Amino acid sequence: MIGMSRASKQSRSMIQAFLVAVGGAIGSVLRYYVSQLALRIAGPAFPWGTLTVNVVGCFIIGVFAEMIVRRFDASPELRLLLITGFLGGLTTFSSFSLDAISLYERGATVASAVYIAASVGLSLAAVIGGLALMRAIL
């Protein structure tokens, strides 16, 4: 940002923050709806909603990483909107952690361990799958 005035830097920063906020709002609302749907379908015994949004979000970040970052040299603004904002709002490590501890504290030790292993394993596999899909297509 050499040569940019202080006002220009502040304006750019505000636009970037706005893009993150918009993407985050959309991702957060989608996470809410997915969690509510999972709760209605599967009930409250296991955190299917959090697992779903985290795994899907990991697949999408694999797709986005290959497609918009590496292949199409996306603008920093598009990256902020989609990766930092949307996927940051959609996925949730804090809810995953709380869900795992809640299962454990309720005495569902095996379910907690399965949830942790499934979350980490499936999420990593989803990123790899997203990357591989885009590499095969592009």
Residue ranges and their predicted role:
Residues 1-138:
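Membrane-interface helix-loop junctions in multi-pass transporters/channels
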